Amino acid sequence: MLYILSGTSRSGKTIVAKEFLNKTGIPYMSVDSIMMGFTNGIPEYGIHDRLWPNEIAEKIWPFLKAMCENMIWQEVDFVLEGEAFLPHLIRELLDNNPDKVQVAFMGYSDSNLEEKVKDVKAHSSGVGDWLINEPNDYIESHI
């Protein structure tokens, strides 16, 4: 089974993926790691970490789709998590493989923007946290 966990930035996708790993033993990978492979390994592809999340999703989708299709074909149990799975992009993959793909989208509805920025700053671990040193307006545009 291929599990895809997507949603807005800072909604807890990585936390859920890690907990799922601990409970099931099914490994996960963050699409952020794949995107940084493009950023630092093959910058000529134009996929980099300074694009807006929707731009990254559109540009990286052909690669992710091919990777997902191969994992499904090989019957690999795996979790992929990240913002780069937009509903309109993933629909075909899900429709073609309803018994082999599970998708969940995460977000937050009970928080206003100012509260969420405070939460981002207050609950940052600092480890791998790409928003920790960014100004409030940049954080607001990504959450």
What does each model-found stretch correspond to?
Residues 55-107:
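Glycine-rich phosphate-binding loop used to anchor ATP phosphates in small-molecule kinases
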Residues 15-18, 22-63:
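Conserved substrate/cofactor phosphate-moiety recognition/catalytic segment
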Residues 5:
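Hydrophobic anchor at the beta1->P-loop junction of P-loop NTPases
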Residues 12:
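Conserved glycine(s) of the Walker
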Residues 33-35, 85-86, 108-113:
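Conserved nucleotide-binding/hydrolysis micro-motifs of P-loop NTPases
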Residues 2:
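Walker A (P-loop) ATP-phosphate-binding motif of ABC ATPase nucleotide-binding domains
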Residues 8-9:
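The conserved Walker
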Residues 99-143:
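A glycine- and Lys/Arg-enriched "phosphate-lid" helix/loop adjacent to the NTP-binding pocket
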